[in-house]
């Protein structure tokens, strides 16, 4: 099987077509311009620097461009980085398209939509069910295409819906173990907690923050959406207030982006399973490319820790 970008080890030479996920111009200590590139294929992404760039290079090696690249995998501060030897734009004769380089969720969109719909169908509280169904219907096209984040966890096509499906399965297990849990409130919180990402982020390809993302953020966005849809459906009362609290508090702490800590049972569960699923996704991503008996590269989103891949099974 042909090796992909993250299959290469430090010291090996890469000769691949890759998609430029991001391209940022900088100035080196010697005063010369360079480009900081993030290059990706279906296996993931790596950073690279293109030194001594000309003005034409900014256009040739911008976001969403496909390039053919030769270079070496190096270790830079505990992380793999690509040192570029040669780079050129791909042409029509190369016969490559952007979709070939984009990581996607391991479950297809139709299966995820069916599973999420089943959880909504199981809700017994009519108000929570109506709000959840209406918001998901309003944004369903983007919801099943968007990543869950720009970086760190589930940052791939359909990553948002895959994150939600994984969390719904965790939520069901918790509710099965603890009968006091309000399933309807928990399921609604899981399905809606990151829905604001479809407004906060630009899309599944070369994802950036939108104006709303930079100035408001996905938590405030989804709470505003809940308020609007509740008004449209003539729903008011405690359910709406508590649902908004569950969504507002799902990051757990003020320093992590939540204006309130979790103050109801389901809010605390949502925070914990969100953190668990995101953390395990980040670990799996690096351990997948770590040999048994070795430590992974450092994971910035997990306190810059390296994780050990045990030899035994």
Curated annotation (Swiss-Prot):
DNA-binding region: 22-90
Pfam families referenced in this protein's UniProt entry, alphabetically: HD (PF01966), tRNA_anti-codon (PF01336)
Top-level division of the source organism's lineage: Bacteria
Top class in the EC scheme: hydrolase
Its EC number(s): 3.1.-.-
Residue span(s) of domain HD: 163-279
Example GO BP: rRNA 3'-end processing
Keyword presence, DNA-binding: yes
The UniProt record lists the keyword DNA-binding: yes
Gene Ontology MF terms: 3'-5'-RNA exonuclease activity; DNA binding
Coiled coil: none
InterPro entries linked to this entry: 3'-5'_exoribonuclease_YhaM, HD/PDEase_dom, HD_domain, NA-bd_OB-fold, NA-bd_OB_tRNA, YhaM_exoribonuc/phosphodiest
Keyword vocabulary terms for this entry: DNA-binding, Exonuclease, Hydrolase, Nuclease
Reported function: Shows a 3'-5' exoribonuclease activity.
Family in the record: Belongs to the YhaM family.
Name assigned to this protein: 3'-5' exoribonuclease YhaM
Origin species: Listeria monocytogenes serotype 4b (strain F2365)
Lineage of source species: Bacteria, Bacillati, Bacillota, Bacilli, Bacillales
Gene: yhaM
């Amino acid at each position: 099987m042909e090796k992909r970008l993250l299959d290469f080890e430090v010291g090996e030479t890469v000769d691949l077509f890759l998609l430029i996920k991001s391209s940022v111009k900088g100035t080196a200590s010697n005063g010369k311009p360079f480009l900081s590139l993030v290059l990706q294929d279906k296996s993931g992404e790596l950073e690279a620097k293109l030194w001594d760039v000309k003005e034409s290079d900014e256009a040739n090696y911008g976001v969403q461009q496909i390039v053919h690249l030769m270079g070496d995998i190096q270790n830079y501060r505990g992380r793999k980085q690509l040192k570029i030897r040669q780079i050129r734009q791909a042409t029509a004769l190369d016969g490559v398209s952007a979709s070939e380089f984009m990581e996607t969720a391991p479950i297809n969109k139709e299966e995820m939509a069916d599973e999420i719909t089943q959880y909504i169908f199981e809700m017994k509280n009519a108000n929570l069910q109506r709000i959840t169904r209406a918001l998901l219907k309003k944004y369903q096209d983007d919801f099943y295409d968007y990543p869950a984040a720009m970086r760190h966890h589930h940052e791939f096509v359909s990553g948002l819906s895959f994150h939600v499906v994984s969390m719904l399965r965790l939520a069901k297990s918790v509710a099965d173990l603890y009968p006091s849990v309000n399933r309807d409130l928990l399921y609604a919180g899981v399905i809606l907690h990151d829905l604001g990402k479809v407004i906060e982020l630009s899309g599944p390809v070369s994802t950036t923050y939108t104006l709303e993302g930079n100035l408001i953020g996905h938590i405030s966005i989804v709470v505003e959406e809940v308020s609007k849809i509740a008004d449209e459906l003539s729903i008011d009362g405690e359910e709406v207030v508590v649902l908004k609290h569950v969504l507002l508090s799902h990051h757990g702490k003020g320093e992590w982006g939540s204006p309130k800590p979790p103050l109801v049972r389901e809010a605390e569960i949502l925070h914990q399973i969100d953190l668990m699923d995101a953390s395990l996704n980040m670990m799996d991503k690096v351990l997948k490319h770590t040999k048994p008996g070795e430590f992974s590269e450092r994971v910035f989103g997990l306190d810059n820790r390296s994780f050990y891949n045990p030899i035994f099974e």
